[in-house]
């Protein structure tokens, strides 16, 4: 890519650093931000090949050490180099595209593993729907910079294009995969390498007709990758735009294959209110009734489950409560935040208020009951999932969603594809 004119949705092949086939299942790891350090230490017991040794390298150091200590990033870089040296990882000789298919509970999604442009991140061709936090960006900037690589893929989506689907489908049918394994959570992972130049050209050209890509998951990773690329440009003022640091590792999925799960909330107290006072206050904004099933999972938008004192309630928002014409304010996560968590419980900033926590739908509503019954939390709220159409519309409008609006399953595994910035 040169500094002048360019086309939209530029994707390009790359020489992946990736595990040898027989080690792929052991290498593949959940994303760094899904596990805390203690959980990661447990996961890697007996597995020296887990990519968590790169993505969360503090697990190989003194537990008293901060995960943001310089030594953690240095250890990550050392561990990646060691994997390459020991030939746990190889690097493909020629640039290629890759297909990455995940199947969970009978539902498959097939993504194209590519490099995308930091310029398109910067000019909003790659659209966002979340704000990022500086300290989280800084963590991944340091990680990418020291490792000299994008180690975790950015999960991108695009409005479905039949031509792309057809090419991916036919390639899968006609070629043997490079990886196939079922992870411990039952998700099946299969990958193919697309090395045929004519097919690569066809796919690259197909994306030039796609006006936008959208970040589904990985706002901090993408922001960090783009910033490292800009840092490298400053260090290399004669850059051409074709160097690897101008691009970052992404997996592109058609929007209609993705599954957003519920992202639920638990709160530690009722802001000094008795249960009776709390129930009375929320009737300003919601119709409240005892649920006829337990646990209660909302089956349509604008309805919520609430678990308190061993009882489930169904909440239905009153129409006059919110502006139905406002894309963001009309989201279920916004309605709960604006009119219950903020107005009644005075939890105004869910990012920083320790009185609220978030529970991904993968953990089930029984987890909400367990947390409240333990006494650690006073109430739990189950939500109807945000839709893909809402995500795309909000990103198109240049708006941002409230924190913790979307929980995607299945999670992409890290370590199957690494993009070197060299």
Q: Locations of the language-model features?
A:
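Surface-exposed, charge/polar-rich loops and edge strands
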Residues: 2-422
């Amino acid at each position: 890519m040169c500094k002048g004119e360019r086309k939209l949705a530029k994707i390009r092949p790359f020489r992946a650093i990736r595990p040898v086939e027989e080690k792929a299942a052991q290498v593949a790891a959940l994303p760094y931000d899904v596990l805390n350090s203690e959980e990661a230490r447990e996961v890697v017991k007996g597995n020296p090949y887990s990519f968590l040794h790169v993505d969360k390298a503090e697990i190989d150091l003194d537990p008293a050490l901060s995960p943001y200590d310089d030594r953690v990033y240095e250890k990550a870089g050392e561990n990646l180099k060691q994997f390459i040296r020991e030939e746990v990882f190889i690097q493909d000789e020629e640039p290629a595209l890759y297909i990455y298919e995940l199947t969970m509970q009978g539902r498959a999604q097939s993504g194209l593993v590519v490099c995308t442009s930091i310029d398109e991140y910067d000019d909003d061709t790659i659209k966002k729907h979340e704000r990022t936090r500086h300290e989280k960006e800084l963590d991944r900037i340091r990680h990418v910079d020291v490792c000299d690589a994008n180690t975790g893929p950015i999960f991108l989506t695009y409005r479905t294009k039949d031509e792309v689907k057809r090419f991916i489908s036919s390639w899968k049918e006609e070629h043997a995969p490079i990886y196939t394994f079922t992870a411990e959570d039952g998700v099946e992972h299969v990958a193919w390498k697309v090395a045929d130049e004519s097919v690569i050209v066809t796919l690259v050209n197909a994306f030039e007709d796609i006006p936008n890509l959208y970040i589904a998951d990985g706002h901090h990773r993408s922001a960090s990758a783009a910033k490292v690329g800009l840092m490298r440009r400053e260090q290399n003022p004669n850059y051409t735009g074709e160097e690897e640091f101008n691009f970052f590792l992404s997996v592109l999925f058609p929007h209609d294959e993705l599954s957003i799960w519920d992202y639920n909330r638990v709160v530690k107290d009722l802001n000094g209110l008795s249960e009776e006072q709390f129930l009375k206050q929320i009737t300003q904004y919601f119709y409240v009734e005892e649920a006829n099933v337990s646990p209660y999972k909302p089956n349509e938008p604008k309805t919520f489950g609430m678990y308190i004192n061993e009882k489930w309630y169904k909440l239905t928002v009153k129409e006059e409560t919110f502006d139905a014409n406002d894309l963001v304010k009309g989201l279920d996560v916004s309605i709960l935040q604006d009119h219950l968590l903020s107005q009644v419980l005075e939890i105004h900033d869910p990012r920083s208020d320790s009185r609220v926590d978030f529970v991904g739908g993968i953990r089930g509503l029984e987890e909400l009951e367990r947390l409240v019954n333990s006494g650690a939390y006073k109430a739990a709220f189950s939500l109807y999932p945000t839709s893909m159409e809402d995500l795309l519309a909000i990103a198109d409008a240049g708006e941002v969603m409230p924190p913790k609006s979307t929980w995607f399953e299945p999670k992409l595994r890290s370590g199957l594809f690494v993009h070197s910035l060299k």
